[in-house]
Curated annotation (Swiss-Prot):
Classification via InterPro entries: Long_scorpion_toxin_alpha/beta
Domain of life (superkingdom): Eukaryota
UniProt keyword Signal, yes or no: yes
This protein's record includes keyword Iron: no
Similarity field: Belongs to the long chain scorpion toxin family. Class 1 subfamily.
One GO-annotated biological process of the protein: defense response to bacterium
Key words, A-Z: Antibiotic, Antimicrobial, Cytolysis, Disulfide bond, Hemolysis, Ion channel impairing toxin, Potassium channel impairing toxin, Secreted, Signal, Toxin
Protein name listed in UniProt: Potassium channel toxin MeuTXK-beta-1
Length: 91
């Protein structure tokens, strides 16, 4: 039962993140919805890692360039799942 709740919470967070909710909203939700335990710590870590990830980066080639032009007016480069503005790949 608890595993189903965790999966449901995670899928709900993924769905709501596309609506513009930020990481702090999900952290607050996890804090109040999940009792204090190792499970809460794991969920908060997952929310933090997912919040830092920019999924559009590897899927859409121009995502980082558009993102960095909006923020810093620099060329954007995809480094794994993160966009780096003005920092080309070091290969």
């Amino acid at each position: 039962m608890q595993r189903n709740l965790v999966v449901l919470l995670f899928l709900g967070m993924v769905a709501l993140s596309s609506c513009g909710f930020r990481e702090k909203h999900f952290q607050r939700f996890v804090k109040y919805a999940v009792p204090e335990s190792t499970l809460r710590t794991v969920l908060q870590t997952v929310v933090h890692k997912v919040g830092k990830t920019q999924f559009g980066c590897p899927a859409y080639q121009g995502y980082c360039d558009d993102h960095c032009q909006d923020i810093e007016k620099k060329e954007g480069f995809c480094h794994g799942f993160k966009c780096k503005c003005g920092i080309p790949m070091g290969f």
